[in-house]
Amino acid sequence: MFCSEKKLREVERIVKANDREYNEKFQYADNRIHTSKYNILTFLPINLFEQFQRVANAYFLCLLILQLIPEISSLTWFTTIVPLVLVITMTAVKDATDDYFRHKSDNQVNNRQSEVLINSKLQNEKWMNVKVGDIIKLENNQFVAADLLLLSSSEPHGLCYVETAELDGETNLKVRHALSVTSELGADISRLAGFDGIVVCEVPNNKLDKFMGILSWKDSKHSLNNEKIILRGCILRNTSWCFGMVIFAGPDTKLMQNSGKTKFKRTSIDRLMNTLVLWIFGFLICLGIILAIGNSIWESQTGDQFRTFLFWNEGEKSSVFSGFLTFWSYIIILNTVVPISLYVSVEVIRLGHSYFINWDRKMYYSRKAIPAVARTTTLNEELGQIEYIFSDKTGTLTQNIMTFKRCSINGRIYGEVHDDLDQKTEITQEKEPVDFSVKSQADREFQFFDHHLMESIKMGDPKVHEFLRLLALCHTVMSEENSAGELIYQVQSPDEGALVTAARNFGFIFKSRTPETITIEELGTLVTYQLLAFLDFNNTRKRMSVIVRNPEGQIKLYSKGADTILFEKLHPSNEVLLSLTSDHLSEFAGEGLRTLAIAYRDLDDKYFKEWHKMLEDANAATEERDERIAGLYEEIERDLMLLGATAVEDKLQEGVIETVTSLSLANIKIWVLTGDKQETAINIGYACNMLTDDMNDVFVIAGNNAVEVREELRKAKQNLFGQNRNFSNGHVVCEKKQQLELDSIVEETITGDYALIINGHSLAHALESDVKNDLLELACMCKTVICCRVTPLQKAQVVELVKKYRNAVTLAIGDGANDVSMIKSAHIGVGISGQEGLQAVLASDYSFAQFRYLQRLLLVHGRWSYFRMCKFLCYFFYKNFAFTLVHFWFGFFCGFSAQTVYDQWFITLFNIVYTSLPVLAMGIFDQDVSDQNSVDCPQLYKPGQLNLLFNKRKFFICVLHGIYTSLVLFFIPYGAFYNVAGEDGQHIADYQSFAVTMATSLVIVVSVQIALDTSYWTFINHVFIWGSIAIYFSILFTMHSNGIFGIFPNQFPFVGNARHSLTQKCIWLVILLTTVASVMPVVAFRFLKVDLYPTLSDQIRRWQKAQKKARPPSSRRPRTRRSSSRRSGYAFAHQEGYGELITSGKNMRAKNPPPTSGLEKTHYNSTSWIENLCKKTTDTVSSFSQDKTVKL
């Protein structure tokens, strides 16, 4: 454990309290943190090294080096170094600024003060000076300086409360408690200074919810777990003081261990652009070779005789060597086909798009003051190409606000409402709820409409009392009183809050807890139970239990959990009650309610003592501790007596149905990945409109092994494609072209809508290598896919499967810690700021408060970003090919001498001054249709999914367009200058006038072209386009003026040329002719295309223009209700760890789903919906609505 290799050799950590000398021999990290990358001395070399690792920067650096060689450079060094230095400087300033703030943050944290026990005295020390093994005193509302073993606190039994918002985003308080042997130390400094315990524990890791260790002190060993540890980043709350021993410091703390780098994501356009840039480099080399060969031929055939003004010694250099030098010269001249400004412009545009998302008030959730946040600036255009959405349910599609609705106790349902004829009826506003106002500590917002439960409580039904007693005892809720004396519950899951609140209103009030006791008020009587054991929840157990001793001395085990798990633990005598309760659970799940089973067991005192002794031994074990504890839990949680079941409601979020429908019309497939049971998952599908009664079939895959799963998948495919048509070949399509062909086959083959439901157990087999192809083929042919009972790992595996084999852009959206792996795996990760903390938000690329904002994020911001980026790239490549290839044509008329056409300053400023701002304005602000029409017509989204706006074909069209423009730019002026004289009779066919004419023509042509490309004009577009032209002429006349020539005669030799040339009418005629010849074919083509073959976007633009002239009153969409048959389902899923229980069971009400945004459930047809939307009483709109074959 010594020297630099200690991390590799450390297998366990040994820490001795109050002994720095002992701990220093292990060379543990100190408490100083470093998140900064540079210092004053290392910034320049490290930053330059990082920047030149980028291929583009390294490429331009190589060009700069070539330009420093006089024999091959026709351009001076500043033509490359000016833009390169500009880019390098901008990036360096940005990196330096970011690192300055990191330094500032590091210093602020490292210089925080803590009271440290040194030499038997408490001394104020900076955090960075704290060492492993030190004992620290914390006071209320202080941040925790390092990962501490809690020794004692001001609260009884060594309890303390911490807020972990900086770790996991959760603002609710969590309880930690010290060992009883150390809690006795209290605040006695002398006893704390004499504490010399030795902790042997796990090595530093990033697991926030797990800790294993042993404290050896006074000849005895004590087991340590996560409840004894306070982590760095926590804040001490509601506790006057506490003392802790430093276990991990600085970079070894769990907070810093979790601050690893996020996986870098690149867009499909980035990957395509990298490929195209390589192609351009190849094209550039080919041009260089052609011109080099031309130079060699010219030198050998013409150069030797070309001696009128040039004199050199014969045989001084060979034609081949001349061609070699010319090759490199033209590589330098033609490098502007990929200017360095391209990469800077792309980042600026993406930054602008990110700000638009952050500033969008329509994605601002005013109830909680939560705006939409683009947490990355590199993925915006990818939002316009999404094909698959993978969504969590609870807290994402639903509100994750739980309400206790129904329960089954001893075979009887409570919570139903009956009429005078004892017939079950709907709950209406006229129905009076149970009056809880007489109970002073009741929750005023709680409502329950069945009065029979209160009657059973008053009559003293023992089963009802035991049921409510269990709800008040078996949980992880913390209680406190506010300033008004009201009882407040700190809950870690909304489910537990709903159950404990229900028990509270029915007279069984949870009051307080300590590590050894739980106090509740039972119908007015205060009762304290001794807490003997807490059997925590995890994803395998799917249940939690507490073992308590009541005042009469009886030992009880109370348990709640998933019915499938708990029913297996029941005593055989429960058979009749089990049947009744199962029926009730099916009924609850059919109504979309989240369910839990409730059971208990009476324990013999002798048996419990023997079991508890084994549990203590297992907790003290250093090997296989978890396995031994799990076995003991299984042993005691058996022969349970069933009490009943609970049913909690979780409503859909506002706007979910409309959003799902709209995204489906945009050809986006939504897969729900939930921890719910199968029936509940089906129910949420119906509630969200993803499943309908009109579907041809819903395939349910529930095989118990790989063979059964494979057979079910293949049988489903046979049903889908037909018995006599063997479509599948067992292979998954990977290329986009093949995928489009596959889609066309499916359209011909599948005549209806299908859905796939698969549970987690079957999914585990379906994800095996020999079955996953069948799963993926079937799933991708279905309109809806719902995976239920899935683990966080399976969620990520499903996303990776589609990413890898479908070549499709994926998006994952969720709100909880169990969604983090899925969010990180997808191309785009979206976090919902919900009830389950901020883990998902912190791991996401984009975040907002409501699922409905996903519609605007994709259909508006995503589509616009893709549209703008594609137009930007098309124009940028066109502009630079038109600009650069003029040199190629000129080479044939200048003896392939690598002479440039333009002035060197024009070459330097063309991309960074003359044409940079207009294209940026278009890339940031342009839009084809308004945001409202983007939402109302989801089919506008499809071009992005099919990569229609920028692909290899579009690139070649841009290249050909640029080549044509370069031909016009060169040959029209060349032909005009071939034999021409000015108005004064003087010959004007000089090189300088020719260069000025071509440069002016180029600036005007590309400005006119961007004006034609701009669909949405703003004040900024006008200023940038006309301003750029004005800047060009201002700089041109300045550089050609007598004044600048007098100061820099060598750099600006074209004195007076601009004034002389641009005062000639024939020059302006040439410029006009060049401009018209360049843009008229484009104007003609676009006019014919829009008139004869309009896209959907073209038609919507026509409609927008017509709407400005005649704006008819908007009509509301028809509202319909769907009645559905009862579908049963249960829900249960938790996050692992103490107190994070019952947080991902997922249900929804299937009958009469609640209104969302004024729309309960609307049946849309993709064609008729768009037609109805766009029929607006004008001829243009009428023709649009009648055109049912929309060309994308």
Curated annotation (Swiss-Prot):
It is found in: Cell membrane; Golgi apparatus. Component of a P4-ATPase flippase complex which consists of a catalytic alpha subunit and an accessory beta subunit. Interacts with beta subunits TMEM30A and TMEM30B. The keyword Cell membrane applies. It catalyses: ATP + H2O + phospholipidSide 1 = ADP + phosphate + phospholipidSide 2. InterPro entries: ATPase_P-typ_cyto_dom_N, ATPase_P-typ_P_site, ATPase_P-typ_TM_dom_sf, ATPase_P-typ_transduc_dom_A_sf, HAD-like_sf, HAD_sf, P-type_ATPase_IV, P-type_ATPase_N. Pfam families: Cation_ATPase, PhoLip_ATPase_C, PhoLip_ATPase_N. It is a multi-pass membrane protein. Component of a P4-ATPase flippase complex which catalyzes the hydrolysis of ATP coupled to the transport of aminophospholipids from the outer to the inner leaflet of various membranes and ensures the maintenance of asymmetric distribution of phospholipids. Phospholipid translocation also seems to be implicated in vesicle formation and in uptake of lipid signaling molecules. Keywords: ATP-binding, Cell membrane, Golgi apparatus, Lipid transport, Magnesium, Membrane, Metal-binding, Nucleotide-binding, Translocase, Transmembrane, Transmembrane helix, Transport. Gene3D superfamilies: Calcium-transporting ATPase, cytoplasmic domain N, Calcium-transporting ATPase, cytoplasmic transduction domain A, HAD superfamily/HAD-like. Mg(2+) binds at D392, T394, D815, D819. The active site is at D392 (4-aspartylphosphate intermediate). Ubiquitously expressed at moderate levels. Its cofactor is Mg(2+). GO terms for biological process: Golgi organization; phospholipid translocation. One of its GO terms (cellular component) is phospholipid-translocating ATPase complex. Residues 1104-1125 have a biased composition (Basic residues). Belongs to the cation transport ATPase (P-type) (TC 3.A.3) family. Type IV subfamily. Residues 67-72, 299-327, 893-904, 977-990, 1041-1060 are exoplasmic loop. It comes from Homo sapiens (Human). Residues 1-44, 93-276, 350-871, 925-954, 1014-1019, 1086-1192 are cytoplasmic. This is Probable phospholipid-transporting ATPase IM. SUPFAM superfamilies: Calcium ATPase, transduction domain A, Calcium ATPase, transmembrane domain M, HAD-like, Metal cation-transporting ATPase, ATP-binding domain N. Its EC number is 7.6.2.1. One of its GO terms (molecular function) is magnesium ion binding. Residues 1104-1130, 1143-1163 are annotated as: Disordered.
